[in-house]
Amino acid sequence: MHSMISSVDVKSEVPVGLEPISPLDLRTDLRMMMPVVDPVVREKQLQQELLLIQQQQQIQKQLLIAEFQKQHENLTRQHQAQLQEHIKELLAIKQQQELLEKEQKLEQQRQEQEVERHRREQQLPPLRGKDRGRERAVASTEVKQKLQEFLLSKSATKDTPTNGKNHSVSRHPKLWYTAAHHTSLDQSSPPLSGTSPSYKYTLPGAQDAKDDFPLRKTASEPNLKVRSRLKQKVAERRSSPLLRRKDGNVVTSFKKRMFEVTESSVSSSSPGSGPSSPNNGPTGSVTENETSVLPPTPHAEQMVSQQRILIHEDSMNLLSLYTSPSLPNITLGLPAVPSQLNASNSLKEKQKCETQTLRQGVPLPGQYGGSIPASSSHPHVTLEGKPPNSSHQALLQHLLLKEQMRQQKLLVAGGVPLHPQSPLATKERISPGIRGTHKLPRHRPLNRTQSAPLPQSTLAQLVIQQQHQQFLEKQKQYQQQIHMNKLLSKSIEQLKQPGSHLEEAEEELQGDQAMQEDRAPSSGNSTRSDSSACVDDTLGQVGAVKVKEEPVDSDEDAQIQEMESGEQAAFMQQPFLEPTHTRALSVRQAPLAAVGMDGLEKHRLVSRTHSSPAASVLPHPAMDRPLQPGSATGIAYDPLMLKHQCVCGNSTTHPEHAGRIQSIWSRLQETGLLNKCERIQGRKASLEEIQLVHSEHHSLLYGTNPLDGQKLDPRILLGDDSQKFFSSLPCGGLGVDSDTIWNELHSSGAARMAVGCVIELASKVASGELKNGFAVVRPPGHHAEESTAMGFCFFNSVAITAKYLRDQLNISKILIVDLDVHHGNGTQQAFYADPSILYISLHRYDEGNFFPGSGAPNEVGTGLGEGYNINIAWTGGLDPPMGDVEYLEAFRTIVKPVAKEFDPDMVLVSAGFDALEGHTPPLGGYKVTAKCFGHLTKQLMTLADGRVVLALEGGHDLTAICDASEACVNALLGNELEPLAEDILHQSPNMNAVISLQKIIEIQSMSLKFS
């Protein structure tokens, strides 16, 4: 027991944490027994590690690049900041230098002024102390010559015997001084143009020349120049009709004439010196207008001294009678009435006696209103080319023509419609309103300022008598014309009724005409000839110049005028029909020849000056088509469309420029095609017509200029404030986009004119007045949508015209063929659901990658309009480009069969010529020839009885579009076209075209409804 315990104790002494040390195993056989790694796996591991390393390197590289860029940007910003600071420093230095230079210049100017002032101060004392006996100035050679001439004339005057009766006005020194005194530079002095001041002249009695020498001073040449400049300024200021006279009095023509005669006889100096220099010779000079001469008469001084009485008593009356005493040949655009100079033998004798009396210097009885005694004189009035003994007759003729001018002025101002009556002879026949307007005006109406003599009372009475007789004749002729108008208007009304009898109308017309000719009095030869000519030409020349009339005061006169205007309205509008309109209505108007209306075409007196179409009494031909359609081809064009251009004026950056239509118009003129066509006067389309397709906001925005826009509601004009209408272009102009430029003043008018030209031309073709037509218009329109302007287009001319024809002229079915290389997205949008209009477009599509991106083959319409929208969308780009073969194949397989099935009443063609060869790829890039366009037009003329209207759309190569326009107009005229090449006729279209056509046929075969 004890031994067991001791053994346990021994075992417990061994350390528990120590392990027995085993020997190192150095055998290699155990390693060979371990599993071997597959080399493929090892390769993959290595590749993964390599990729990981590469990724780490890329990340490190990107980090380095980013760090480099960041540092580079920081350095760049620092460099820019340093440059800005350096520039600021340079600018500051430059400004300081400029300020220093300015200060130096100012200092230099001050020094120069100071030196000049000192120099003048040094020169003044010698001048102030100069002896008065010495000369103060040296006279110029001109002044010396004038002085010598004056002294010679003075000595000649002394040599001639002088008495109280032989003093002429031109040689009286005191009178010369009086006339010269009025050339002072006072504000009330008259200008050099011949108008006289309103104050009166006081002429002192005759004095000896030794006591009153007329020379006031001897002016040197610089003084003359200064005076002439000041006089010219005063003359320019006083000659303005807008400035009132400070004197306050009305200057009569008679007073002006009397002073002008006096002044012209005493002074004829140069314009530079005025009347301050003496006369050139002993005789007076002719006045500015060369209408009168004042010879030295025994009573010249008496005549001048009595001038004040004449002016005071008769100036106002004469002013009210004859407001313009000159230019009898001006007729204000109306034919002058022949003067009556051969009234009777007694009148001739009276004129002869008066002429003899005038030659002797004795005034006629009552010549100056009865205020001049018999001893006064009257200057001889000589006209150019007239002897002195015929002065009275020439003056009489002059006054008669002046009275006619006054009557014509009343006619233009709103008097009697055709033959106004003279207020001199028949004051009781003028309405109170008219009589009130012809009282003495406070401000004289503007007219030519002349110095012809005013008529005298005896001559005025003669004028009154002759004008009264002439007025009676004209009044009878006017009444006859009104009666003939009534009869002819009745005959026209009978023609419109089915049971009208032309023979009865003719007999009634002839009977009334004979009765009026019997009642017409026969007075003078000229009056009778005028009367007969007026009656004979009444039927052929129906119509007269309609002048705006002033409203009459009395109700009775207003009713009479209203009745007469109503009776004449139907008849007066007939001459305004254009020749093409009358030709189209030849079937309806053939019976009018029986009553004298066959001269309607021959006598076209007055053409309309408005841009709107002329109104007609007969029914509109579009409502009831004539039996035979017109045979003419119309051309619509207006120069207003040339003004639509960018303000930069560079046509190279803007392909849609004014040279397009200008070149086409010139080509048509050069080839003579324009002479074979009917020129159609264009007009601006109304906003209501534009709103047939476009929204009200769009039509107001692009259809009005800034002047018109001020009158519109700004809320309608601006619309959505968030919408941006115009933007600045790189060239400096404005535009809707980078291509569609906008001119604030002219673009709206040009766009409306383009629409109006197409409407006018299509209306005349639809009504039968024209066979077909071509509208040479710009800007184009087939890209313009309801509220969007794009692609050079603002208003869709063809779409608006189509709706106008359908709504206004009842054209039920219209075919629109778009030949432009770009798709007409605006036209498609306007008629996408409309079954009355078939739209066919041939355009480059390229799967939507060509502008405007629309026009896919599967866009066939919607609703009732499904199948009435056909897009011949070419694909495949320009490898190869489409040409004549492809377009002819499209017409043969799709356009012609579908159009014949549709059977349109009218064909509108969007004639875009940018598919022609010569256009760059961005603008088209196709290779269609101009000859092909002519043949395509000829094929379209087989539809709708030939009623085809082409409207220019795109096309920017000038030579190409001119050739195509010439070919199309030749086709419209029916001329022989240049044949296409044989290889084109027998060639097959390219594969891209075949694929496109097959796809279109497949799609349309399922959607066409009218087949």
UniProtKB/Swiss-Prot annotation:
<feature type="modified residue" description="Phosphoserine">
    <location>
        <position position="451"/>
    </location>
</feature>
<dbReference type="GO" id="GO:0001818">
    <property type="term" value="P:negative regulation of cytokine production"/>
</dbReference>
<feature type="region of interest" description="Disordered">
    <location>
        <begin position="494"/>
        <end position="536"/>
    </location>
</feature>
<feature type="region of interest" description="Disordered">
    <location>
        <begin position="110"/>
        <end position="139"/>
    </location>
</feature>
<dbReference type="InterPro" id="IPR023696">
    <property type="entry name" value="Ureohydrolase_dom_sf"/>
</dbReference>
<dbReference type="GO" id="GO:0004407">
    <property type="term" value="F:histone deacetylase activity"/>
</dbReference>
<feature type="compositionally biased region" description="Basic and acidic residues">
    <location>
        <begin position="233"/>
        <end position="248"/>
    </location>
</feature>
<feature type="modified residue" description="Phosphoserine">
    <location>
        <position position="220"/>
    </location>
</feature>
<keyword id="KW-0539">Nucleus</keyword>
<feature type="modified residue" description="Phosphoserine">
    <location>
        <position position="240"/>
    </location>
</feature>
<dbReference type="GO" id="GO:0005737">
    <property type="term" value="C:cytoplasm"/>
</dbReference>
<dbReference type="GO" id="GO:0032869">
    <property type="term" value="P:cellular response to insulin stimulus"/>
</dbReference>
<feature type="modified residue" description="Phosphoserine">
    <location>
        <position position="22"/>
    </location>
</feature>
<feature type="region of interest" description="Disordered">
    <location>
        <begin position="262"/>
        <end position="304"/>
    </location>
</feature>
<feature type="binding site">
    <location>
        <position position="646"/>
    </location>
    <ligand>
        <name>Zn(2+)</name>
    </ligand>
</feature>
<feature type="binding site">
    <location>
        <position position="731"/>
    </location>
    <ligand>
        <name>Zn(2+)</name>
    </ligand>
</feature>
<dbReference type="InterPro" id="IPR023801">
    <property type="entry name" value="His_deacetylse_dom"/>
</dbReference>
<comment type="similarity">
    <text>Belongs to the histone deacetylase family. HD type 2 subfamily.</text>
</comment>
<dbReference type="GO" id="GO:0031078">
    <property type="term" value="F:histone H3K14 deacetylase activity, hydrolytic mechanism"/>
</dbReference>
<dbReference type="InterPro" id="IPR024643">
    <property type="entry name" value="Hist_deacetylase_Gln_rich_N"/>
</dbReference>
<dbReference type="GO" id="GO:0005654">
    <property type="term" value="C:nucleoplasm"/>
</dbReference>
<feature type="compositionally biased region" description="Polar residues">
    <location>
        <begin position="522"/>
        <end position="532"/>
    </location>
</feature>
<feature type="region of interest" description="Interaction with MEF2">
    <location>
        <begin position="136"/>
        <end position="154"/>
    </location>
</feature>
<dbReference type="GO" id="GO:0030183">
    <property type="term" value="P:B cell differentiation"/>
</dbReference>
<keyword id="KW-0597">Phosphoprotein</keyword>
<keyword id="KW-0678">Repressor</keyword>
<feature type="region of interest" description="Interaction with ETV6">
    <location>
        <begin position="218"/>
        <end position="261"/>
    </location>
</feature>
<keyword id="KW-0862">Zinc</keyword>
<feature type="region of interest" description="Interaction with MAPK10">
    <location>
        <begin position="175"/>
        <end position="343"/>
    </location>
</feature>
<dbReference type="GO" id="GO:0007507">
    <property type="term" value="P:heart development"/>
</dbReference>
<dbReference type="GO" id="GO:0035097">
    <property type="term" value="C:histone methyltransferase complex"/>
</dbReference>
<keyword id="KW-0156">Chromatin regulator</keyword>
<dbReference type="GO" id="GO:0034739">
    <property type="term" value="F:histone H4K16 deacetylase activity, hydrolytic mechanism"/>
</dbReference>
<keyword id="KW-0804">Transcription</keyword>
<dbReference type="GO" id="GO:0061629">
    <property type="term" value="F:RNA polymerase II-specific DNA-binding transcription factor binding"/>
</dbReference>
<feature type="region of interest" description="Histone deacetylase">
    <location>
        <begin position="631"/>
        <end position="978"/>
    </location>
</feature>
<dbReference type="GO" id="GO:0045892">
    <property type="term" value="P:negative regulation of DNA-templated transcription"/>
</dbReference>
<feature type="compositionally biased region" description="Low complexity">
    <location>
        <begin position="262"/>
        <end position="285"/>
    </location>
</feature>
<comment type="function">
    <text>Responsible for the deacetylation of lysine residues on the N-terminal part of the core histones (H2A, H2B, H3 and H4). Histone deacetylation gives a tag for epigenetic repression and plays an important role in transcriptional regulation, cell cycle progression and developmental events. Represses MEF2-dependent transcription.</text>
</comment>
<dbReference type="GO" id="GO:0051153">
    <property type="term" value="P:regulation of striated muscle cell differentiation"/>
</dbReference>
<dbReference type="GO" id="GO:0003714">
    <property type="term" value="F:transcription corepressor activity"/>
</dbReference>
<dbReference type="GO" id="GO:0046872">
    <property type="term" value="F:metal ion binding"/>
</dbReference>
